[in-house]
Amino acid sequence: MSLDYVKFTNGFEKFMPKEYRDMVEHGPFGKKVSVSQMGSFKEILEEHPMCAGCAMTLFIRLAMIAVPNPEDTIMVGTAGCGRLAISQAAIPFVYGNYGDQNGVASGLSRGLRLRFGDKPKDVVVMAGDGGTADIGFQQVLHSWFRKERFTTIMLDNEVYGNTGGQESGMTSRGSVLKMAPLGKKFDKMDMVGLAKLAGCAYVATVVPNNPRRVESVIKKAVLIAREVGAS
């Protein structure tokens, strides 16, 4: 986890695929880039197998640009639509068992601080509403209680979109889904309120139709988690 891991080993550049050479030469590693510069540098995430027009994929692209030091960052995820794109990004990605992403991130975050001391090494969890608010809720909440120094990003599309359309805790009351044909009968979970109650140092909600705000929020979240506690 350093700028060195994305560079070429001497003498091997000519053997590397063009995509890799482009990433080293024109990617964001070791540079300060912004969403306002999209199109002028090679993004960490470009090609992906997500559905055409998926807003979640746009958000993931924006979040990857916003990460302050991508060369010193590990992404952690779990089952869900989002991991199909996250796993294609040029950032180390740890894919845990369903719902254990915040437990994995807790160990990684602590281990990196022990190994590298004061050098900034960031851990960012990115998972869907099912993995975060339902199946992984226990580990998510307790990582917040412990003030673990990493960022948790919930990709809330209000449905288990990868397994047929089941309702989740984050589905809005009354929403009709393939696996909830009569509509959800319960309210959407207040994850923002729960995060505040658990003592997160920084809590925010964003939508991908405001790229500059996405960039600002993600950057703040990672930097605050690095120095203060859970975000």
Regions found by a protein language model. Name each.
Residues 1-5:
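Iron-sulfur cluster-binding cysteine motifs and their immediate structural context
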Residues 8-152, 170-172, 184-185:
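Cofactor-binding active-site loop characterized by glycine-rich and histidine/acidic residues
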Residues 119-124, 135-138, 142-150, 155, ...:
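Glycine-rich ThDP/TPP pyrophosphate-binding loop and its adjacent helix/strand module
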